[in-house]
Amino acid sequence: MIEVVLQVLSISAITTTIALFFCGIPICMQIRRQGAVGDISGVPFLMGVLGGSFWLRYGLLKMDYTMIIVNVVGVFCMAVYCIFFLIYSLPKKTFTCQLILVTSTITGMVVWIAFKPNLDYLGIICMTFNIMNFGAPLAGLGVVLRNREVSTLPLPMCVANFLVSSQWCLYGNLVQDIYIIIPNGIGMFLAIVQLSLFIVLPRRENEKSPLEQLANWFTGRDRNKKEKDLETGECAEPSSPQKIPSDVHEKLEKLMAAEASSESRRCSADFMDHPPSYKSRSSSVPDIFSVQS
């Protein structure tokens, strides 16, 4: 039974971890669109190559095929991201020096393990790299707590980190590997803290958190407030005159124009049928144009 659970968990951990490695593709697409790396840091890619290489050597030394498959794919993806980052980085000197340092560290580790294979020493180093990677989002948590909102936290990434960390923590318990349990347990704890912030804090400023909305729904505070506002007249809006629809307005204008035209024709007909009579009256003014004979 344990073997079946371990196989299912291995397949699930491989799938979710490889899917998490593909999160670098949107970053590379953004770099390509803007034509340069800009403010994007290449350190996560370098740390991915470094940590993946150490974990790959750890898996080879332990002959753990689940770790071997995951870290082969991980090192390949992170190496491709590093090459892509190097192409678009200006100037290239800084990132090239960092890449040489990482490559030298990996080479030294491979030579050291070849002459002195020690699983415990390598496990401690791998565990340290994992804890450093999981501790990187702590700066983002500081920003969230300072702003009292979670708009800067990516929810899909937090959920993915929780799934991957919890699966590897359970996998470490099944294979009884403390070097897998400790870093992934810390990562799972940090992921739970991040996910809890989505419940406690609002998504954006001037919004209510889901926890506050749920509390108001249970206590009926919002309903009581609305009823109180209705009683005091705060929610009553002043009545505004109804706006006549445009089609009705046009029909009224046409009807008024037709009535005005009909009234004008009726007045003209009355004038023609009954013209006004003018009474002639003698003028007392002498006719200055008549010639007396």
Swiss-Prot record:
Membrane-spanning parts: 8-28, 36-56, 67-87, 95-115, 124-144, 155-175, 180-200
Cysteine-cysteine disulfides: none
Keyword field contains Metal-binding: no
Domain MtN3/slv: 7-91, 121-205
Molecular functions (GO terms): sugar transmembrane transporter activity
Any one of the GO BP annotations: carbohydrate transport
Keywords: Cell membrane, Golgi apparatus, Membrane, Repeat, Sugar transport, Transmembrane, Transmembrane helix, Transport
Residue spans of biased composition, Polar residues class: 279-293
One matching Pfam family: MtN3_slv
Record's subcellular location: Golgi apparatus membrane; Cell membrane
Source superkingdom: Eukaryota
Membrane topology classification: Multi-pass membrane protein
Residue stretches of biased makeup (Basic and acidic residues): 259-273
Residue span of region Disordered: 225-246, 259-293
GO cellular component, one term: plasma membrane
Family of the protein in this entry: Belongs to the SWEET sugar transporter family.
PANTHER family: RAG1-ACTIVATING PROTEIN 1 (PTHR10791), SUGAR TRANSPORTER SWEET-RELATED (PTHR10791:SF43)
Functional summary from the UniProt entry: Mediates both low-affinity uptake and efflux of sugar across the membrane.
Protein's name according to its UniProt entry: Sugar transporter SWEET1
Organism: Caenorhabditis briggsae
